[in-house]
A protein has these predicted regions:
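OB-fold and OB-like single-stranded nucleic-acid-recognition modules
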Residues: 1-114
Length: 114
């Protein structure tokens, strides 16, 4: 939903939400591709959340990736990090408090942040 009609890229708003609110919203998909999360009168694509890392999974395989579990007291959501971004986040540890701005995604009936 980023506006590219003027030739300039316009980033979507990163809404401040609680994790528990995300799971109350309704995901809209088109051909199994996530478009946005409807929460009240808002159409949410990007989120801004502060929480604690409660779990970390590092694949350590050829195609390295991380799964982090973020908890803000209202719920938990996975953060999935792939490709070149893996090295940027390799120092994150369980128990740390982090501010996350990322895009919501939907796969296999699961909403996560990337």
């Amino acid at each position: 939903m980023a506006d590219q009609t003027s030739g300039q890229f316009k980033r979507n708003v990163a809404f401040k939400v609680r994790i528990g609110e995300i799971f109350l919203g309704k995901p809209f998909l088109e051909n199994e591709k996530f478009l946005f999360l409807e929460l009240g009168n808002r159409k949410i694509i990007r989120v801004n959340i502060i929480g604690n890392i409660v779990d970390k999974y590092d694949s350590q395989s050829e195609k390295r990736y991380f799964f982090l579990t973020l908890d803000d007291g209202s719920g938990q959501i996975k953060l999935k990090i792939f490709g070149d971004d893996v090295e940027k986040f390799s120092d994150i540890r369980q128990g740390q408090t982090v501010a996350v701005i990322g895009n919501l995604r939907h796969f296999n009936n699961e909403i996560y942040i990337s």
